[in-house]
Amino acid sequence: MGAGGRMSDPSEGKNILERVPVDPPFTLSDLKKAIPTHCFERSVIRSSYYVVHDLIVAYVFYYLANTYIPLIPTPLAYLAWPVYWFCQASILTGLWVIGHECGHHAFSDYQLIDDIVGFVLHSALLTPYFSWKYSHRNHHANTNSLDNDEVYIPKRKSKVKIYSKLLNNPPGRVFTLVFRLTLGFPLYLLTNISGKKYGRFANHFDPMSPIFNDRERVQVLLSDFGLLAVFYAIKLLVAAKGAAWVINMYAIPVLGVSVFFVLITYLHHTHLSLPHYDSTEWNWIKGALSTIDRDFGFLNRVFHDVTHTHVLHHLISYIPHYHAKEARDAIKPVLGEYYKIDRTPIFKAMYREAKECIYIEPDEDSEHKGVFWYHKM
């Protein structure tokens, strides 16, 4: 995955790891003015087309696997199942991305429609829609703020745990990456791991969690009921089809969605060129600019371009995915050196970031003491 090697764009040259500037000379208004007006239009018909398209593709994958893999000789079936898992997880991640767009009111002009579609899609993929919508909103409002960001908050050198030092070797990095990719999102939802530190235990299922305010608590409970309904449906499927069938056809692809989601967001927010800010330096546009686009090759399209339009998304989150590339290209001349896309092959980038981005510290000789950069051990 990842194109690698294409260097025609000045935002992706040899110095891709070079730090971005920290004092943008433009405003959000300047960026919006550069984007064609039609890019802000949200069509419920066009958005719904992508939902239907992905559902049809997901059904085709299901039908082929359910019908033909049981007919394949056992040794070959062991190869066929991972192919199904990858394909189904990929298309389901596309549906998850559409649910995420609903949370940003980028699906249609009607908030109710957005919330209904997002609630159904995310619940089916075991994500508490409203709960995650609200915590994710906090992330967008406080991106790369060391004091207030909701997730992906790196540690200072003095706070690095002993196990991080023990795992600072090739086998340890592989273990850390596998753990992060498979369990990172479920543990974030359940225990707020890697999330903002609150005065008490926080998770995404407790309506009284400090993550949420009083106006959001009823909808958090609604998210829980949505998941309970899905778990009840899973129970009925296990009774009818057996646990092995449910695991192969549904559970592993849904786990794959979590893997893809963590992989994408980890790479968007973890890079040697990206700063973090304390309260003396942070403002909204500085934080929103502190992300990087990535190239997932053919999966860019499957994931509805969320992989390589993330910088735009953090600046203007309500632009629908089918206008995102055009809008991104429109603001790139304004962004200049503040925009970066890293086309390093994904597995190589994953390992590099796990090796190089361990903790953050400000530069000792810098006048910006509230600007923090990644370092390795």
UniProtKB/Swiss-Prot annotation:
**Stretches that traverse the bilayer:** 55-75, 79-99, 112-132, 174-194, 220-240, 244-264
Q: Where is this motif: Histidine box-1?
A: 100-104
Q: What class of enzyme is it?
A: oxidoreductase
Q: Which GO terms describe its biological process?
A: unsaturated fatty acid biosynthetic process
Annotated membrane topology: Multi-pass membrane protein
Q: Which domain of life is it from?
A: Eukaryota
Q: What EC number(s) is this enzyme filed under?
A: 1.14.19.-
| Pfam families for the chain | DUF3474, FA_desaturase
Q: What CDD domains does the entry give?
A: Delta12-FADS-like
- The protein's name is Delta(12) fatty acid desaturase DES8.11
To which species is this protein native? Answer: Calendula officinalis
